[in-house]
């Protein structure tokens, strides 16, 4: 049974937006719309307690144990070496940092350990086991061949004593081979959800849950989460919120399901959520040719995998053009479900919830917050992460003892396949070191941390778009003030510098030295000067209403002039987030008397449409991959071909940015 198969509903097949077959999110079997309504009406008690509106700080709190555990799973890890190998590797890096064996040490974000993904054993979904044996042998072989060949090249190209020393340092060569092989093995396990023939684990879990969801209440709330996901920026904070709320929905409706074990035993990883909610968007109605859609997904997965593995080349395949299949309309123009959105806005109000504390907690003590101390928050987070690592080591030791006992009595009790295939252990977490200084980088759409020219692969302004309705309004006001600052032909960088200075002066209550941990001030979004908490009136026209608060100004200081310039005018990833984000929907809190009505409308219409097609997001991800990948001759040829198509794509999507050829090597 394929869990991602969309089954036609038995309800009405002509929604308000035109005649087409109505589909529900990936289910098996799919409940009819009439059964959903009947079950809802027959369960007044369940309806009264269901007040889930999505994207709320009630379900994702920075100090909760679940949040810390999710962040722990999203951190990179490094396999430790013994002292002798570590000393040899350090000496090799000092002598020849460009050696292929040392390039992977430079990419600290790559070395991590995560277990395999096996929904089958834990949930008894089906007998088929998810494996990646072929991928494993290929990756390890390539890693060994690259290092070996690289050593020969390095030895022949380096002239003088330094080159001779690097070529003859056998201990360093062995250290590089052992570390790279171990890291690649753990990266292979992490990338299991990104394989071509691996099913979506979330779809498998959803199919099981729907069989137990007798009154369809869980389906309605899951549909609301998917609806809000379509209007959320693709940022690390968005991924964390989705993971947390999805987990809470499972815990709330299926108490017998040990959701903690899904992450602890690596049945689910962060890339399962990337795949389901952002890359493949399994809940979205299929538009166009099924094979073309599959190719878009597989290409996107290959690019993400290449960034995680730190490969030298970007898996870019120039799209084939079929003249006979030309479309008269712009294929990149998306019709949004305006009637459904209007209905949602009519029965909702912008929430004052703000995820700034969670944002600071995520990136405290990392390179993303390099100029922001956050000492107390950093100390708290690191202590919690260390506690989780210690608990994981104890769990590993317990599981190993149980496996040894099972082996001793092997023929008498038989083998338990769940323990020997990696599904019951932590997959080597106890043998790896958490890279706390990098942060939960695998929550990001670009799962690699780089810095270049005062920018990084984590855009704080994109993260801020997922924080609150208020932050989106102030960001839009900031953009308006920059582009309309004066009538003279002043460069954008100068405009940003001047506007930023004005904004910092306008900040009503600047932070003093006593507020070193600025996150304490971001519990709720500020109200208007009159005390009104209704943000429908906030607009960029009234500067008093859209005035930034101290927390917002602090984030602007951290981003800097260059980061603001990159976000608004240079980066296609940021431009895509600006295009798709609808803060009124994302942070809309449904009125209590219309919660069930709106959820039913969303589930029935099944319009989970993003304002940018998945192919556009694929090209944006390719652009980001080219930015962080080392330039080789083959890579330069691919980049030239890609840039010609990419600039045309931006024009077709009506996205106006600084020419990408100017910024492809300038920022990350």
From Swiss-Prot:
Binding site for Zn(2+) 1: 200, 203, 276, 282
Region (Zinc finger 2) residue spans: 459-574
Positions of region (Disordered): 1-35, 392-430
A Pfam family hit: Herpes_env
Region (Zinc finger 1): 200-282
GO MF entries: zinc ion binding
Binding positions (Zn(2+) 2): 459, 462, 567, 574
Entry's transmembrane regions: none
Keyword list, A-Z: Host cytoplasm, Host nucleus, Metal-binding, Zinc, Zinc-finger
Record's subcellular location: Host cytoplasm; Host nucleus
Regions of compositional bias (Low complexity) in chain numbering: 19-35
Cellular component, GO, one term: host cell cytoplasm
Record's compositionally biased regions (Polar residues): 1-10
Bias (Basic and acidic residues): 392-401, 410-419
Protein role: Plays a role in efficient localization of neo-synthesized capsids to nuclear replication compartments, thereby controlling cleavage and packaging of virus genomic DNA.
Family per record: Belongs to the herpesviridae UL32 protein family.
Designated name of the protein: Packaging protein UL32 homolog
Gene source species: Human cytomegalovirus (strain Merlin) (HHV-5)
Gene responsible for this protein: UL52
